[in-house]
Amino acid sequence: MMRLDFQRKLLSHTERVKAVDFHPTEPWVIASHYNGQVGIWNYNTQTLVRSFDINDVPIRACAFIARKNWFVCGSDDFQVRVYNYNTGEKVTQFEAHPDYIRALVVHPTQPFLLTSSDDMTIKCFNWDMSWKCVQTFEGHSRYVMSLAINPKDTNTFASSCLDGTVKVWSFGSSVANFTLQAHDRGVNYVNYYPAGDKPYLITAGDDNLIKVWDYQTKACVRILEGHTNNVSFAFFHSKFPIIISGSEDGTVKIWHTLSYSLIKSYNFSLDRAWCIAQNKDNGLVTVGFDNGLITFSLGRDEPSVTMDSSGKVVWSNYNEVMSAMIRPAKEQSDLTDGSLISLSVKELGTTELYPAVLKHSPNGRFVSVCGNGEYIVYTALAWRNKAYGKALDFAWSADSNVYGSRTSDRSIVIHKNFKESNRLDLSYSCDKIFGGFLLGVVGSDFICFYDWDTGILVRKIDVKPKGVYWNDDGRFVILACDDDFYLLGFNAEMFYSAVESGTADEEEGVADSFEALADVSESVVNGKWVAETFIYTTTAARLNYLIGDQTYKIANVESSFYLLGYIPRDDRIYLTDRDMNVVSYSFNLAIIEYQSLVLKGDLEAAQGLLEQISETDRPRLSDFLSRLGYKEAALELSGDSVQRFELALDAQRLDIASQIAQELDDPLKWRSLGDAALNAWDFVLAQECFEKGKDYGSLVLLYTATNNHEGLKELSQLTKSTKINNTAFICSWLTNQPAECVNILTSTQRYPEANLFAATYCPDEVKNVLPEWKVDLTKNQKERIADSLGDLELKN
């Protein structure tokens, strides 16, 4: 049975929804309502972006025309209306039919709008020709309920009608290519199968049935029964092998396209289901009901793709399996970090089940396919079936001849050389299994690790990881949980010794076999080990690596990209999205080896690797050394002047910092160096730095502390000439120049302070300052205050 991962993105309680559509690039859903309104919703923020009051009659059809920034809607007043969804301006309005408009479809490449109506016709309008009706399709005998353009041949389309038929048409011909007598009652919906392997149509009718048709042979392939009222729609999902149907019985049902069995039935308590739309890029689905709309996803976000160490990429498109070989980096002259890589794709074969998970064996010779409750192991080169069986989950051991399959919640079968070698019957219910050096079995809130050969419990750990990643030699393992991940060290000798001595606990395992080494507060999307370095992508859209207990950023990436792996031949990391857009980033393994040796304290051996590391990468290593406290080594390695200056300060190499400051000639750098020199009691260097950095406040402190009377006098004159009056005043005061202090206060029109200071410290200056104060008061119309001051000169 296929497992669904239902995640609700948007739920809105609204008036009856009659039509929905996705914007191809924005996170928007448009919905038209029975009350004559149209709303655009953002399913990421769950907010209404814009609302349009179109009219007061039902609007049964709407769609985005994204390449024109428009949306179009058709209603029961026979009108088609077109609006600019950015400005809210109505672009045009015209009568398309003499009766209710039931459906409309926008052609994916041509400037065509198809409409269908209760007048039993279909019309094609060309917006480049001022919305001229360029063709009318006649032949149905009742209301035409839905339209669908063939994604594999956009010159043809299908229509469904309440006369019980489905007709397939071609643009340019007014006569239907053929007619299917699809249902005993009205046909509400028609939809094309999106993949290239099957020429199928699906129909939904008022006889409560869903039917799958081969439009080449005109034969009914399968009838799906389960709804108890009129079926409003049945829809092939573009990403997963499922059919989604909705009915006036209020349910939305999910069916498997391979077995045609019912997987799941949902009732969202929104009454009758009327309409559906799908985002072809991300697989999101929106369904409209009597009482609102809901947007949701059903499958895993990760693409079904795997890559071996040579660069061979294998992925699936439904049950078709494709492959491509990534060309060596030296053959790609335009290769840059983050740029798209051109792939030469070929069809590798098909698989008998839908591959939810594809995984290369460690040696790259085999590829496992797991899905629909089964697994198949294929040879990687010829794509021949090597083994198969039941499996809810599949996991490879570090030994490519050993693998495990979870056949039920309490049973795991281990195979060796493609034959069953052991079986674990668990005392608890398990959710998932992981491969690697040990077999990881996830319970309700813990994970148990078992030895592949003996099935003995190695250790029970009280965390529930969503991902388990072993390095190649089995000494380290990452447990990736929802919000953080843990680095553990594994001591195999400790485990085997405990087993031999009989001290292994049957319920907890060997406590000392694992050691916690690091706890990192980041959410891992997926990851790979390269030697002793863990490379991973995060939910924050970053590509990072962990070495020791320190994390470092490689690049920011799109959130939709997933890690494929590292190719040593290219020294590059490769990532892909669901549409197999592959990008890469440089990752020099010599850098990692250098960092690993430094973490072990072997700086001498690390120095021997520097020849393999480019000058552009060395500043990053310099940062790494600095963070570990190796300031001198970081200084020697760095070639960036700004970085070297900071490192020289940290290493207290003031001579080197002084040379760099001379080169940079930045006042801020001089001031920083001056502070460092002051802390080192190097007053000569400090004075030079503060002078060149024009740090006059620090110079006052330095001259005062060293009793440099002449320095203060010179500083007083310098700051006075540059109008730094506070410093000039302090320097004049400290050098016992009260008259100069009065002069500074007067020049800045601080007359009250000047008179008070003069009267206190140099009375002879009052006769010069007081008249200026009085003149200033009079100028500001304060004659009474000026007259009341009296003759302070006489009093003194």
UniProtKB/Swiss-Prot annotation:
WD repeats lie at residues 4-42, 46-84, 88-126, 131-170, 172-214, 218-256. The coatomer is a cytosolic protein complex that binds to dilysine motifs and reversibly associates with Golgi non-clathrin-coated vesicles, which further mediate biosynthetic protein transport from the ER, via the Golgi up to the trans Golgi network. Coatomer complex is required for budding from Golgi membranes, and is essential for the retrograde Golgi-to-ER transport of dilysine-tagged proteins. It holds the Pfam family WD40. InterPro entries: Beta-prop_COPA/B_2nd, Coatomer_complex_subunit, COPB2, G-protein_beta_WD-40_rep, TPR_COPA_B, WD40/YVTN_repeat-like_dom_sf, WD40_repeat_dom_sf, WD40_rpt. This is Probable coatomer subunit beta'. Oligomeric complex that consists of at least the alpha, beta, beta', gamma, delta, epsilon and zeta subunits. It is found in: Cytoplasm; Golgi apparatus membrane; Cytoplasmic vesicle, COPI-coated vesicle membrane. Keywords: Cytoplasm, Cytoplasmic vesicle, ER-Golgi transport, Golgi apparatus, Membrane, Protein transport, Repeat, Transport, WD repeat.
